[in-house]
């Protein structure tokens, strides 16, 4: 890769996983999920990896609450899970609310998680508040993905992978 007049060499930081998804940088570590490998990984800048097995959950989107706990979108069970550093427990069961498996997720500075369903049409985005209140905040989406909250915290932006916008 060349940027300007400098030549850069890209070097892999980590490998050995199946389908990396939902990368987040938190407390000096890169966190990411491996949906097909059913785990969440961390890796530091030296390439040292650790693994949190999540058999039966197919984790996708990740996000951190202000207290440092990790939220995990469980693709197949359609649950949002919370990892506090020791245990993994369900925070919200969205199976009766979302039309398809869960996908991307982003968490704002107030600890509210915005989770997309991977429906090719009729998808929704659900907000899970810290008190576990669940609210559908957007609907009729074509595979919502790639969510980000603007730095001022006022706008949630989302790509529609199938809708191509």
Predicted regions and their residues:
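Sequence-structural signature of mature extracellular/luminal beta-sheet repeat domains
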Residues: 1-165
